[in-house]
Amino acid sequence: MPSLYLASGSPRRRELLTQIGVPFTVLSTQIDETPFDLETPAAYVERLALGKAQAGLAALPADQQACVLGADTAVVLDGRILGKPVDQADALAMLAALSGREHQVLTAVALTDRQRSETCVVTSRVRFRPIQPHEAHAYWTSGEPADKAGGYAIQGLAAIFVAGLHGSYSAVVGLPLCETAELLSRFGIPCWQCLEGDKS
């Protein structure tokens, strides 16, 4: 069985991959995340997920039997990608734009080894209730929005803003577990290898 590497610094992706009982090692990768002109959000997240996985594989010894998993998430409103806020004003503007509306969250997963690469993109729809200005300010003060796509974390304090979700909750957090498990199985990596409470 090949060794699995996660090409992501995201603690949320580490937690999600651990949740399905797959042993892995974290790889630190850096790629250019600038969108291409006229690139669709789906093509963007797929390109970045694959780029992270390929960069991770390139950092490993050439004779090592390994699979590398990469992922990328984008929050999309009216066809526009909302990245990580650059400052308080940017974060408050994002929350105001998302307030009382439905938006899309696209997460791409890529898995690559020495022979092949496979990807998938999962689209979910999230609906926010109206967010009051004082709530947006308090949320920014918490520090949570600073490094989050779209300026919020559905699994954190921003859960109180979520009036509805259609799609994959784990994908909105950062890694669609159903689709990730399917990809892993196609590369010969089963889930549930590390089960909590397993005494064997």
Swiss-Prot record:
Reaction(s) this enzyme catalyzes, per UniProt: dTTP + H2O = dTMP + diphosphate + H(+); UTP + H2O = UMP + diphosphate + H(+)
Protein name, per record: dTTP/UTP pyrophosphatase
Subcellular localization: Cytoplasm
Lineage: Bacteria, Pseudomonadati, Pseudomonadota, Gammaproteobacteria, Pseudomonadales
GO annotation (BP), single: nucleotide metabolic process
Highest taxon listed in the record's lineage: Bacteria
SUPFAM superfamilies named in the record: ITPase-like (SSF52972)
Cofactor(s) for this UniProt protein: a divalent metal cation
Site positions for Important for substrate specificity: R12, T73, Q155
Disulfide cross-links: none
Pfam families registered for this protein in UniProt: Maf (PF02545)
InterPro entries, alphabetized: ITPase-like_fam, Maf-like
MF terms in GO: dTTP diphosphatase activity; UTP diphosphatase activity
EC supergroup of this enzyme: hydrolase
Keywords, in A-Z order: Cytoplasm, Hydrolase, Nucleotide metabolism
One GO CC annotation: cytoplasm
Its job: Nucleoside triphosphate pyrophosphatase that hydrolyzes dTTP and UTP. May have a dual role in cell division arrest and in preventing the incorporation of modified nucleotides into cellular nucleic acids.
Family affiliation: Belongs to the Maf family. YhdE subfamily.
Annotated active site: D72
Enzyme Commission (EC) number: 3.6.1.9
The species this protein was found in: Pseudomonas syringae pv. tomato (strain ATCC BAA-871 / DC3000)
